[in-house]
Curated annotation (Swiss-Prot):
CDD domains linked: DHQase_II (cd00466)
Gene: aroQ
Protein known as: 3-dehydroquinate dehydratase
Assigned EC number: 4.2.1.10
Taxonomy of the source species: Bacteria, Pseudomonadati, Campylobacterota, Epsilonproteobacteria, Campylobacterales
Signal peptide: none
Any one GO molecular function term: 3-dehydroquinate dehydratase activity
Keyword Acetylation listed: no
Length: 158
């Protein structure tokens, strides 16, 4: 099972960016922890980070009819502004879980609305870097349930 992990703008500078909000973890450390967790669950991860909205949309569109069983995404500030990324999530054809390091509901008012979260299967927010662990557990559970249902349908049709 292959899961796509998409990281949005400014996440490439985690560890340096406002550590009082986002902690001291770097993106590489988060990815290494996710990779270890995925290995324990017989899953493969592909990581993608971009500061550009269109590149994130292009990557989500690769999920259509593709090899991914699900997406874990931290759209960062784009979650509050990008209807285009929300549309790409809604039409990518696989379950998506949104994750935020900080609690977006406890910050500035404009951060409390998530266009992308509204079209995701779930949203994990405010657990720091551990939120990625929770999000991966969630997307693996959903993807496994979908795979089991598809197998059951195939057995009934055989």
């Amino acid at each position: 099972m292959k899961i796509l992990v998409i990281q949005g703008p400014n996440l490439n500078i985690l560890g340096h960016r406002e550590p009082h909000i986002y902690g001291n973890f770097t993106l590489d450390q988060i990815h290494n922890n996710l990779q270890a967790q995925a290995k324990q669950n017989n899953a493969e991860l592909e990581f993608f980070q971009s500061n550009f909205e269109g590149e994130i949309i292009d990557k989500l569109q690769e999920c259509i009819g593709g090899e991914y069983a699900g997406v874990l995404i931290n759209p960062a500030a784009f979650s509050h502004t990008s209807i285009a990324i929300a549309d790409a999530i809604a039409s990518c054809g696989v379950p998506v879980i949104e994750v935020h390091i900080s609690n977006i509901h406890a910050r500035e008012e404009y951060r409390s609305k998530s266009y992308t979260g509204a079209v995701s299967a779930g949203v994990i927010t405010g657990f720091g870097a551990f939120g990625y662990h929770l999000a991966l557990m969630g997307i693996l559970q959903i993807a496994n349930e979908i795979a089991a249902l598809k197998a059951q349908q195939n057995n009934q049709n055989a």
